[in-house]
């Protein structure tokens, strides 16, 4: 039903693309991150929850955005299309396609951990499941969110006692709002970089409850930064903007913090393992929950996932992509290179590609079926 082209995944029967890489006439979009939402398309179909952030990011192309409720079916040239929660960020969706009795689901980016800032991931039964694999290696297993946010708040409180401002870096759309939701506002004021503040205001307008925040530049002007935590995109580290806060302790929240040496390479004082993607056992459990007989793997460490699923008896192959999700090669320690290397295949107009050549030991990476069920 879908084939890869030089513009991304194409549904020939419906004549539309899913998360295209280049401008097209009609795009069905999973979410508003830049590697999925492309400027210049004539028409976009997104979820109701994701419409505001999509329009904000599209600028002059925002007029082409149409939105549907989760679970609401649209028929596009005979193909029944519906969007279902992906749990990645506000409005993130999986795309379900049904045509002539065949059902495909495109996951987009997703996580199965609960998140108060977006609708929870929903397993959707299908014949073919296209899954991301950003953290598709057995070394990626997330600690509990309670533990992570406990560590973040303790770090912030310790910095406050020592008279330093705390800078916590996370991507401006999605990660930043999830971080804000987990902070303890009794410790001190929560300040936001401009890029974060705009997206945070859209989350609030969308009904997401978040602690009070203040625009960081306003706090700088009035010198009200004592004991504060500043939520900002990673690009601010080492900037003149950051130096205006005086003595600062820095941290980065990402799934990459699970890998040895990532904090040092990021040049931050602390690292917290918090991802908006599935980890290894969650990915395997999500595939099981769909009941899919065929799995196509993209956006990340495709080879190990394909090998594992093939060993389980599934028809699994990799789909080449221009993007690698949030892959950060700088975060991979040289000592982990043997399990973190994958052949990158150039996109082509041919049918979906075969698996890449990365290897893995399935016996060393079995997920516990009782502890790796998806969160619904």
Model segments located where?
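Short hydrophobic/aromatic-enriched beta-strand-loop microsegments
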Residues: 48, 63-68, 187-194, 313-322
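Active-site-proximal loop/helix segment associated with metal-binding centers of metalloenzymes
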Residues: 87-97, 110, 114-115, 121, ...
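C-terminal regulatory/interaction regions
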Residues: 185, 216-363, 368-376
């Amino acid at each position: 039903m879908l084939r890869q082209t030089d513009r991304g995944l194409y549904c020939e029967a419906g004549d539309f693309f899913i998360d295209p890489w280049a401008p097209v006439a009609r795009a069905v979009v999973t979410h508003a991150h830049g590697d999925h939402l492309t400027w210049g398309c004539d028409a976009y179909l997104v979820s109701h929850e994701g419409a505001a952030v999509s329009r904000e990011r599209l600028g002059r192309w925002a007029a082409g955005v149409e939105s549907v409720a989760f679970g609401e079916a649209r028929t596009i040239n005979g193909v029944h299309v519906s969007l279902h929660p992906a749990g990645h960020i506000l409005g993130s969706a999986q795309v379900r396609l049904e045509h002539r009795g065949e059902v495909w689901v495109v996951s987009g980016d997703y996580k199965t951990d609960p998140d108060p800032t977006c609708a929870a991931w929903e397993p959707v039964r299908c014949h073919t499941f296209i899954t991301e694999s950003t953290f598709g290696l057995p070394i990626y297993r997330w600690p509990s969110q309670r533990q992570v946010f406990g560590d973040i708040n303790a770090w912030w409180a310790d910095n406050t006692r020592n008279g330093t401002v705390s800078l916590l870096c996370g991507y401006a759309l999605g990660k930043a709002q999830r971080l804000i939701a987990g902070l303890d506002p009794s410790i001190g004021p929560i300040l936001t970089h401009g890029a974060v503040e705009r997206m945070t205001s859209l989350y609030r307008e969308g009904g997401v409850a978040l602690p009070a925040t203040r625009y960081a530049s306003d706090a700088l002007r009035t010198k009200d930064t004592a004991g504060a935590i500043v939520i900002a995109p990673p690009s601010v580290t080492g900037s003149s903007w950051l130096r205006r806060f005086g003595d600062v302790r820095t941290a980065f929240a990402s799934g990459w913090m699970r890998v040895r040496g990532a904090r040092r390479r990021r040049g931050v004082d602390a690292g917290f393992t918090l991802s908006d993607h599935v980890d290894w056992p969650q990915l395997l459990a999500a595939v099981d929950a769909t009941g899919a007989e065929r799995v196509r793997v993209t956006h990340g460490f495709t080879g190990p996932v394909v090998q594992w699923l093939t060993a389980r008896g599934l028809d699994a192959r990799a789909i080449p992509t221009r993007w690698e999700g949030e892959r950060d090669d700088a975060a991979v320690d040289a000592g982990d290179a043997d399990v973190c290397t994958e052949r990158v295949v150039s996109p082509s107009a041919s049918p979906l590609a075969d698996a890449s050549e990365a290897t893995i030991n399935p016996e060393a990476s079995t997920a516990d079926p009782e502890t790796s069920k998806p969160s619904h």
